[in-house]
Every structure is written in structure tokens, then in C-alpha cells.
């Protein structure tokens, strides 16, 4: 009977498997561990999942790495490769088989590479090879760029697309090199020397796409770092992804997170340049308009001041002074216009030396038209002000006492005071009679005052 009771309490295979699975999941050490071993029986499913065996001299274990994790791998796993994998041990219930579920994988032996990387980095840094004062500025408007990279692949295509889109007139020379493997450091160093000796480049870009630390190692070699530092022109390093830092990045004059970003650093955006030129043109026009307004206000002030404060005999002198001011104004405006035009021309030449000729011709034509309009406007304004001044002078001459005297009238002064009535003088007073063409010195011998329309003898 006891034997029958034990049979009644027997577990199913599924129950036993789930129990073992639960034990593994509850174990504090198994959910997150690192395992070192050799890959074998490696295969990748069409859906992206990787299935393989991880083994050493004494044992082996089935493992799987799902596509959601293995898409971040920076190397291609192969049979016989020694690796480090991180993940958890659990049970695959359908087969009652325990296996390793990998979340991260990297080639074993990277530790020695990192140690060599840190050693060389510290040595070159202590030597001053990475010092900021050694860094050279990247030219704003290069005409010829050298690119040192693999002649095939997406890197050179993406860079050329970016360069031609942003700055169509740029010239590019490709130095094809090995970017990984045993001969890569020497290939890259020789290309840098050739680019320096050519003496025709404004900037050099050293580029490579992403990869594992082993694939990028050529750019961590001392030979390459020194070739970059000794280059005759500024060097932009664009190796790997944004998170990758190589010795070449520290030795270069500028680091770009990606090859495409390096192309953007190397050349300006032609559209932005045209917008900048447009802004400068508007600023020039506003400056000229303000100068004209200022000179007009000065002219109005001079007109009001000179027309009413000075005697008529000074009008002609002030008219000459006004002519001088107008000449100075014209010269100043001409000089200002020439200075602005020359500065604008120099800027066009510096920025758009190789810009399409039709655009340059159009800008020059607009500048000439603006200049001609400004000159015509100033000439018309000057003529109008002269006519206005002549009219004011004629009005002043009509109101002048001297003009009245020309018609036969005279002024009588006694002791330099104007005599207005007969009561202002007495018999035997000396008086001065001022005529249009001279003065008469007289003595009063008699006077007759007018009273109520009649006469009275004095």
C-alpha cells in the first residue's frame, strides 16, 4: 500500500521541469553571470536569433542570443572564437534542457588591448602630442580636401554626398587605404605623408566606419597617431561611431563623431553663405540710407541757420560754403559707397571664388544699379536744394532796405541813430543822409513839421 501511495504522488515531466526552472530562477547567482568559453555549432536563424554552444575543456552548454540583443554586437561571432558572454541560465521547458540566454557578447582577450590603449594614450599625452595649443583651426572655406579611407563602402559615399550637397564647388581627392588588418597602420601613415607632401590640400579627413575594437585598432597605433600630428595641414579624425574614441582622435586637430559629421565640419553650407551675403547687403543698404538721412538733416539745419541769421551781404559767401559742404557730402558718400563696395567685393571673392558665375554676375549687376540710383538721387536732391536757396536769396533781396534806396529813397541819421520824425532834430544839428551810392553830411538850417494835414514852420 505504501508503494501505491508513492506512485500516486508522482510528478509529471512538466511539473518536474517547471520546478527545476523555478529553482534556477530563484538562485541569486544565476540570473546575471559572465561565462568565458569557445564558440561552436554557431548558426544564425533567418529571424536574427543566434544559436550556439559555449564550451571549454571540461564541459559544454547550449546557448541562445536573441536578435534584440545581438543587433548591438560590434563583431561577427564565428566557430572557434573565444568569447565572454553575459546573461542568465534557465530551462527550455519543451526539451527539459537548461541553456544560457546571452544578452551581451565580446571577444575574449580585449583586456590586453585596452591596457595597450591606455599605455600609449598616457605616453603620448605626457609627450604633449594631444595638447590643445598644438591644434590647428579648420579652414572656413577650403577649396581642396583629402579623404583617407577605404575606397569602397558607405563611408566614402556618405561623405561625398554630404560634401557636394553642402559645398558643390569643393574638390576632393581620395587616398584609398586599408582601414583594418595588419597592413592598415602603414597604409594610413603613408597616405598622410603623401597628402602633406602634395601641398595642395586645405584639410585632411581620416575616416572609417564603426567596428569592434580589433577592427578599429589600426587607428590606435603610435605610427598613425604621429603621422596625424606631423601632418602639414589640419586633420579631422572620424573613426567609428560617436561612442568610439581612438588614439587618432586625440592626435587630430578635430574629432568628428562620424564620417558624415566630419564632412559637415570640413565645409560650410553654401545656402547659409548666400543668406549671410543677403544679410550683409541689407545692412549696407540700411547704412547708406541712414547716411543720406543724416546729411539731409544737416543740410536743413544749415539752410535754416544761414538764411535768417546773417545779413544779405554774406549770402553769397554762405552759398559758396554750402556748395563746399555739398561737395564734401558727395565725396563722403562716394568714398563710403566705394569702401562698402570694395569690402563687399572682397567678401564675395573670399567666400564665393568658385560659386556659379551667373549668381556672381547677378550680384554685381544689382550693386551697379543700386550705385547708379544712389548717385542720381543725390544729384537731384543737390539741385533741388540749390534752387530753394536761390529763391530765398531773391526774397531777402526784395525785402532789403538797400533795394528800396535804389529807387531814390534815403535814410537820415543823427548821431548814428535813425531819424524817424522832424522832432528828432533841431536847427543847426549835424545829420547824415544815406543814399544808395553814398552818404551826405548836412546841417539843419530849418524844419517844417506836418500837423493835421497842414504845415508848421520852425
From Swiss-Prot:
Keywords: Cytoplasm, Exonuclease, Hydrolase, Nuclease
Residue ranges crossing the lipid bilayer per the database entry: none
Superkingdom classification of source: Bacteria
Pfam families: Exonuc_VII_L (PF02601), tRNA_anti_2 (PF13742)
Primary localization: cytoplasm
Reactions mediated catalytically: Exonucleolytic cleavage in either 5'- to 3'- or 3'- to 5'-direction to yield nucleoside 5'-phosphates
GO MF: exodeoxyribonuclease VII activity; nucleic acid binding
GO biological process, one term: DNA catabolic process
Keyword Cell membrane: no
InterPro entries: Exonuc_VII_L, Exonuc_VII_lsu_C, OB-fold_nuc-bd_dom
One GO CC annotation: exodeoxyribonuclease VII complex
Locations listed in the record: Cytoplasm
Known EC number: 3.1.11.6
Catalytic class of the enzyme: hydrolase
Family to which the UniProt record says this protein belongs: Belongs to the XseA family.
Role description: Bidirectionally degrades single-stranded DNA into large acid-insoluble oligonucleotides, which are then degraded further into small acid-soluble oligonucleotides.
Subunit structure: Heterooligomer composed of large and small subunits.
The protein's name in its UniProt record: Exodeoxyribonuclease 7 large subunit
Lineage: Bacteria, Bacillati, Bacillota, Bacilli, Bacillales
Gene this protein is translated from: xseA
Amino acid at each position: 500500500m505504501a508503494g501505491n501511495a508513492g506512485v500516486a504522488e508522482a510528478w509529471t515531466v512538466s511539473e518536474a521541469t517547471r520546478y527545476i526552472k523555478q529553482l534556477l530562477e530563484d538562485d541569486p547567482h544565476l540570473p546575471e553571470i559572465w561565462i568565458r568559453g569557445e564558440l561552436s555549432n554557431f548558426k544564425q536563424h533567418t529571424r536574427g536569433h543566434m544559436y550556439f554552444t559555449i564550451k571549454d575543456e571540461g564541459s559544454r552548454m547550449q546557448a541562445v542570443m536573441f536578435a534584440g540583443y545581438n543587433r548591438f554586437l560590434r563583431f561577427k561571432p564565428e566557430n572557434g572564437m573565444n568569447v565572454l558572454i553575459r546573461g542568465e541560465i534557465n530551462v527550455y521547458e519543451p526539451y527539459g534542457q537548461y541553456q544560457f540566454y546571452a544578452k551581451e557578447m565580446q571577444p575574449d582577450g580585449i583586456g590586453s588591448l585596452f591596457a595597450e590603449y591606455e599605455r600609449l594614450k598616457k605616453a603620448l599625452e605626457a609627450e604633449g602630442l594631444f595638447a590643445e595649443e598644438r591644434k590647428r583651426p579648420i579652414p572656413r572655406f577650403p577649396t581642396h580636401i583629402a579623404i583617407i579611407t577605404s575606397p569602397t563602402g558607405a563611408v566614402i559615399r556618405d561623405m561625398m554626398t554630404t560634401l557636394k550637397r553642402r559645398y558643390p564647388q569643393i574638390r576632393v581627392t581620395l587616398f584609398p587605404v586599408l582601414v583594418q588588418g595588419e597592413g592598415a597602420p602603414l597604409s594610413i601613415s603613408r597616405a598622410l605623408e603623401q597628402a602633406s607632401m602634395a601641398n595642395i590640400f586645405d584639410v585632411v579627413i581620416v575616416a572609417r566606419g564603426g567596428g569592434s575594437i580589433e577592427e578599429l585598432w589600426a587607428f590606435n597605433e603610435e605610427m598613425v597617431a604621429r603621422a596625424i600630428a606631423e601632418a602639414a595641414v589640419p586633420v579631422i579624425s572620424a573613426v567609428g561611431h560617436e561612442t568610439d574614441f581612438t588614439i587618432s582622435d586625440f592626435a587630430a586637430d578635430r574629432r568628428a563623431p562620424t564620417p558624415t559629421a566630419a564632412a559637415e565640419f570640413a565645409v560650410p553650407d553654401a545656402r547659409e553663405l548666400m543668406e549671410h551675403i543677403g544679410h550683409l547687403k541689407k545692412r549696407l543698404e540700411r547704412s547708406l540710407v541712414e547716411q543720406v538721412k543724416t546729411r539731409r538733416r544737416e543740410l536743413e539745419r544749415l539752410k535754416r541757420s544761414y538764411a535768417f541769421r546773417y545779413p544779405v551781404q554774406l549770402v553769397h559767401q554762405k552759398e559758396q560754403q554750402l556748395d563746399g559742404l555739398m561737395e564734401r557730402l558727395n565725396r563722403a558718400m562716394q568714398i563710403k559707397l566705394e569702401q562698402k563696395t570694395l569690402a563687399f567685393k572682397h567678401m564675395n571673392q573670399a567666400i564665393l571664388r568658385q560659386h556659379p558665375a551667373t549668381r556672381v554676375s547677378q550680384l554685381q549687376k544689382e550693386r551697379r544699379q543700386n550705385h547708379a540710383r544712389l548717385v542720381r538721387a543725390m544729384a537731384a536732391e543737390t539741385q533741388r536744394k540749390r534752387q530753394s536757396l536761390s529763391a530765398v536769396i531773391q526774397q531777402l533781396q526784395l525785402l532789403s532796405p538797400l533795394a528800396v534806396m535804389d529807387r531814390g529813397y534815403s535814410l537820415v541819421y543823427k548821431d548814428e541813430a535813425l531819424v524817424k520824425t522832424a522832432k528828432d532834430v533841431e536847427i543847426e544839428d549835424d545829420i547824415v543822409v544815406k543814399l544808395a551810392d553814398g552818404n551826405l553830411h548836412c546841417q539843419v538850417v530849418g524844419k517844417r513839421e506836418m500837423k493835421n494835414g497842414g504845415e508848421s514852420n520852425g
